[in-house]
């Protein structure tokens, strides 16, 4: 369904007469966010430093519901552990989203200069847990916890960001069953499209803890599609290496395949690893200073993506599998079920044609680029699937889901 940019409404939308280019001074670009470019800026009225996310709604037409969702969630949050949202302005087809500026970068940025020690990890995890405890108390699920979505201020304050796939639980709907998130960090029950709740964030936190310790999540050397098969089938990842027993136990607690046995965020704040090792957030400024030194030494070739994580220009997904841009998997909502930017009834849909089938065919054709007859057969098969999808929207999703179920069943039958 097409959307006219002028018809877009989001919480905190300012009077359309107000010109954001007069109210704010746009400075250097600091990254590419979930749906557009992000700039450092100055509020000319207060001289406050802000982050300005600018989205061309004509180009981001398919993502408008996700943009509304992110702004809706942020506008409802009032926590020092969640990125603050100040308001939005519409100028032509450009939506200006004004947010809190966090100049310390993302945890993923800081990891580029090297892994963290356990005191730094415990300190960062404690702040993430405070953010999750707040969100879960508000019946919200982040659904995309990872180092790229954890931002720091220059003083070391830690905040959760990127709420484009966040979900809202109601009193009558205590679990969700929508396939969203990022494969490497995704909980088994989310991949299987089973009913899930805030405990899915706890699994992602456990994977993030490993990421902070090792510099990357488990299975990062594998194809993301294979990871989707393996996470529900295999035993949970464990932290291997010279780490303390309490840290390994913290991760094991988060990565229980049965969500009912995972602790809550509030319970994890009392875990021995957090209590004994966490320090004041100012302790994290050493990581920020280290990253600045690392960049000054000429190690950084890519632009930092501190204020948004979808492109993750330095991430292992894009480096290892250039044909796949497999970061955050986002839902495709039914516009009829979106009211005031909040999706009331999420559709259980994975965009398999664009996320899985098309990239898979591209890889097959690349592998057999010198075999004309094989490539022609691949193209014919790809066209047939596209025709079937056009005639019966959603049929590809059902087919891939069924293939995953069959694969998992066969794998389980073959297991000793």
Swiss-Prot record:
Catalytic function, reaction form: L-seryl-[protein] + ATP = O-phospho-L-seryl-[protein] + ADP + H(+); L-threonyl-[protein] + ATP = O-phospho-L-threonyl-[protein] + ADP + H(+)
Entry-annotated residues carrying Phosphoserine: 4, 300, 304, 306, 309, 325
Localisation: Cytoplasm; Golgi apparatus
SMART domains, sorted: S_TKc (SM00220)
Domain Protein kinase: 24-274
Main location: cytoplasm
SUPFAM superfamilies membership: Protein kinase-like (PK-like)
InterPro entries: Kinase-like_dom_sf, PDC10_dimerisation_sf, PDCD10_N, Prot_kinase_dom, Protein_kinase_ATP_BS, STE20/SPS1-PAK, STK_MST4
Pfam families membership: PDCD10_N, Pkinase
Keyword terms, alphabetized: Acetylation, Apoptosis, ATP-binding, Cytoplasm, Golgi apparatus, Kinase, Magnesium, Metal-binding, Nucleotide-binding, Phosphoprotein, Serine/threonine-protein kinase, Transferase
Gene Ontology cellular-component annotations: apical plasma membrane; cell periphery; cytoplasm; cytosol; extracellular exosome; FAR/SIN/STRIPAK complex; Golgi apparatus; Golgi-associated vesicle
Cofactor: Mg(2+)
Signal peptide positions on this chain: none
Known partners and oligomeric status: Homodimer. Interacts with PDCD10. Interacts with GOLGA2. Interacts with CTTNBP2NL. Interacts with RIPOR1 (via C-terminus); this interaction occurs in a PDCD10-dependent and Rho-independent manner. Interacts with PDCD10; this interaction is required for the association of STK26 with RIPOR1. Part of the core of STRIPAK complexes composed of PP2A catalytic and scaffolding subunits, the striatins (PP2A regulatory subunits), the striatin-associated proteins MOB4, STRIP1 and STRIP2, PDCD10 and members of the STE20 kinases, such as STK24 and STK26.
Name used for this protein in its record: Serine/threonine-protein kinase 26
Organism: Homo sapiens
